[in-house]
From Swiss-Prot:
Reaction(s) catalysed by this chain's protein: L-tyrosyl-[protein] + ATP = O-phospho-L-tyrosyl-[protein] + ADP + H(+)
Cross-referenced SUPFAM superfamilies: P-loop containing nucleoside triphosphate hydrolases
Compartments (UniProt record): Cytoplasm
Annotated CDD domains: BY-kinase
Enzyme Commission number(s) of this protein: 2.7.10.2
GO MF terms held by the record: ATP binding; non-membrane spanning protein tyrosine kinase activity
Highest taxon listed in the record's lineage: Bacteria
Protein name as annotated: Tyrosine-protein kinase CpsD
Phylogenetic classification of the source organism: Bacteria, Bacillati, Bacillota, Bacilli, Lactobacillales
Gene Ontology cellular component annotations, sorted alphabetically: cytoplasm; plasma membrane
Gene: cpsD
Length: 227
């Protein structure tokens, strides 16, 4: 099994926010015993959804849960900036298109209990791949082997991929950069996730001024939408 190493600069940043993401994972667990597969999306690129996905997965893994992080943003992946490999690795698109076995793309990491499936090469029709039977079968198979599966998706405000993926998950999380996104756009994204029929866990307010007490440390489950 190939091994990925988390970039040292990224790891240093992650450690600074470790306490906050541990609390976020606790909130996820308190939301339901059967929430194993969780999608993470945002309205726009650059809001921190990938950072949030990596941190959630790492927190679960460090707590002793066998955790899989899937890079489902097959259009514009940035997760390769977090994990480094010394060898060529196939990914999600290769498996979904039938050109590679999933076992070839399942990677161990230098973090105990954390495994990763990278996005793979860019597909000419990523939506069709995500709608395929292969994707559904993959998620159902992986459920048997992992305690938690975190799926980083493309921004739901840009493409429909996040909604398609969420339909195969148990719940979803929306990440938004505080002060950078119109409230109406965030509410629309929230509605899209709710329309999948899967539990919407809440909004993570990223880039938040932690001095604003009512949002808590990271804004999850805050007062959003009540003003």
């Amino acid at each position: 099994m190939p091994t990925l190493e988390i970039a040292q600069k990224k790891l240093e940043f992650i450690k600074k926010a470790e306490e906050y993401y541990n609390a976020l994972c606790t909130n996820i667990q308190l939301s339901g015993d059967k929430l194993k597969v969780i999608s993470v999306t945002s309205v726009n690129p650059g809001e921190g959804k990938t950072t949030t996905s990596v941190n959630i997965a790492r927190s679960f893994a460090r707590a002793g849960y066998k955790t899989l992080l899937i890079d489902g943003d097959t259009r514009n992946s940035v997760m390769s900036g977090f994990f480094k490999s010394r060898e060529k690795i196939t990914g999600l698109t290769e498996f979904l298109s039938g050109t590679a076995d999933l076992s070839h793309g399942l990677c161990d990491t230098n973090i105990e209990n954390l495994f990763v499936v990278q996005s793979g090469t860019v597909s000419p029709n990523p939506t069709a791949l995500l709608q395929s039977k292969n994707f559904n079968d993959m998620i159902e198979t992986l459920r048997k082997y992992f305690d938690y599966i975190i799926v980083d998706t493309a921004p739901i405000g840009i493409v429909i991929d996040a909604a398609i993926i969420t339909q195969k998950c148990d719940a979803s999380i929306l990440v938004t950069a505080t002060g950078e996104v119109n409230k109406r756009d965030v509410q629309k994204a929230k509605q899209q996730l709710e329309q999948t029929g899967k539990l919407f866990l809440g909004v993570v307010f990223n880039k938040l001024d932690i001095s604003v007490d009512k949002y808590g440390v990271y804004g999850f489950y805050g007062n959003y939408g009540k003003k």
